[in-house]
């Protein structure tokens, strides 16, 4: 499925900020599709994904910011893609203003 806008959240290990990031994306006034992308899969990331109904995309190979972010972009099936880092917080009108 091709979405108008996708947030691709890059998650690295067990960041204590990841849930706050996800909450800010789920609170958008105009909803966007959200995926979590990681090269460091963990039960912590899986639990948050399950809690918020999000898909987890796992990149094989060594972790590296360039390759991880390119992977996240490639996994997002959208006309517009926002790469969200695990400690980013987005204003609730971000998607509305973007679209």
Show where each model-derived region lies:
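Short, acidic, metal-binding catalytic loop of nucleotide-sugar glycosyltransferases
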Residues: 23-32
